[in-house]
Regions:
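A short Gly-Trp-Pro
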Residues: 1-113
Length: 113
């Protein structure tokens, strides 16, 4: 009997210059209402998918990075400007992907704020 393969989730920026995937289930999917995240997406909230860094990889392209505050990096497509991910020193083994970049966002609905 073969082992079941982990589920693969894919995502991309608007122009498709950056594509990524992660294996398995995310650790969490949540909304953030802090000022920094709201400004980063010009919206009332930002929705993130938290995954272990070891589950994640870029398939195509590399994002640009902006350090929005000490220890906080925000990744975005240098071509179309789509916000792609967030990484912070508080979560050194995680990457927080923007929910809107998922190919099928309904696959992982938000579960909290």
């Amino acid at each position: 009997m073969s082992a079941k393969k982990p589920e693969i989730t894919r995502g991309r920026c608007q122009c498709r210059n950056i594509e990524y995937e992660f294996e398995g289930k995310p650790k969490w999917v949540m909304h953030c209402h802090c000022e920094s995240c709201r400004r980063a997406v010009s919206s009332a909230l930002a929705t993130y998918v938290g995954v272990d860094i070891g589950q994640f990889r870029y398939l195509k392209g590399e994002p640009a990075v902006y350090e929005s505050s000490p220890g906080v990096k925000r990744y975005f497509c240098p071509n179309c400007g789509s916000p792609m991910a967030y990484a912070g020193e508080r979560w050194p083994k995680e990457v927080h992907l923007f929910h809107g970049t998922l190919e099928n966002p309904e696959q992982w609905p938000p579960t909290g704020h």
